[in-house]
Amino acid sequence: MRNDEMYLQLYLIRHGESMGNIETDEPFDKTNPPLTPHGKMQAKAVGERFAELKEFTLYSSPLGRARETASQISTEMIIDSDLLENGVRATENGFEDYYESAEECYARALKVIGKIRSKHRNHENVIIVAHGMFLNQLIKAALNIPCGAMRLSVYNASVTKINFCDDAPVKLALSNDVSHLKETDGEKLFWM
């Protein structure tokens, strides 16, 4: 690889388990559910996994469960409303549900990939913390898989790594990895 060619390692992380991922009678904000105690342990494990990665740019969805997960990696992060979950939008008063088709979500994911690839070109590590349904579309967009071709499982607190290089095809280097959760999860995985 030449020094002048673009090389980007993109890490995609789904937030830890949230109240919206479990069955509960406890009241919570359905649009912006907080992490469960288990989700907080998962977020901590994600932070520990990335502790050795010294140079990176961290992006997070503005929703609390993603920001809380991202904050375990670094307190310095870029909040990007394009990373919101499918069917959620930011308003002056917080967040609200609205209809967003899979195709519209995929178009938003393509926009995010284009933005990241144009902004981060020189041997960079970029970490995105977001949501299951959006990451499903983002992974497909990054790999040039059409929107409706397949549905991917994205576990809570999982890591997917995609490498971009000027002179090679996009590489799915790691998919839905939860090896850092062995202490916290055992067999308990939630996907969407």
Which residue stretches match the model-derived regions?
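Generic beta-sheet signal
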Residues: 10, 56, 122-132
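GST superfamily/GST-like fold recognition
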Residues: 132-136, 171
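Glycine-rich phosphate-binding loop signature in dinucleotide/nucleotide-binding domains
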Residues: 51-54, 116-124
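Active-site-proximal alpha-helix that buttresses catalytic centers in soluble enzyme cores
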Residues: 2-76, 97
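Domain-level recognition of soluble alpha/beta enzyme cores
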Residues: 146-171
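Conserved histidine-centered catalytic loops in small-molecule metabolism enzymes
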Residues: 53-81, 163-192
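Phosphate-handling substructures
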Residues: 33-34, 71-116, 171-176, 191-192
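Short beta-strand scaffold positions
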Residues: 60-61, 107, 129-130
